[in-house]
Amino acid sequence: MRHKKSGRKFNRSASHRKAMLRNMVRSLLTYEHIRTTEPKAKELRSSCEKLITLALRNDLHSRRLAYKTLENHGLVKRLFDEIGPRYEGGGGGYTRIIKLAEPRKGDCAPMCIIELTKRAEAPAEEAAATTEAPAEEAQEA
């Protein structure tokens, strides 16, 4: 019997499951939103929130623990320098799962988007904001 066993198996071996979740965490922290199936997103949420909580502690031991999962120095740096500070003063709830209406073609699996709740400004939006500011100053003068 499988009473009180936490985590989903996804019909994969332990090493495959660990690699899959590790890759999904890397993708979520890189792109800040990904499209996946609902059970995978629910499992990914706990892994990602634990890493963001480590980023809030921001000490050497936390960086080493994060590196064990991410295995990418650039991504660890981004997690601790960019993503972590966005959530200062928050008490969890760093990710959001949005269910999609259309299931996946082929196997009709329920799909969703998992994203960070406080996403970075898109570079296109920042560029548009900076180009509008000088134009407004020229009109005032």
UniProtKB/Swiss-Prot annotation:
Transmembrane segments: none annotated. It holds the Pfam family Ribosomal_L17. InterPro entries: Ribosomal_bL17 (IPR000456), Ribosomal_bL17_sf (IPR036373). One of its GO terms (molecular function) is structural constituent of ribosome. It comes from the Bacteria. GO terms for biological process: translation. Keywords: Ribonucleoprotein, Ribosomal protein. GO terms for cellular component: cytosolic large ribosomal subunit. HAMAP family: Ribosomal_bL17. Part of the 50S ribosomal subunit. Contacts protein L32. Belongs to the bacterial ribosomal protein bL17 family. This is Large ribosomal subunit protein bL17. It comes from Maridesulfovibrio salexigens (strain ATCC 14822 / DSM 2638 / NCIMB 8403 / VKM B-1763) (Desulfovibrio salexigens). The lineage of its organism: Bacteria, Pseudomonadati, Thermodesulfobacteriota, Desulfovibrionia, Desulfovibrionales.
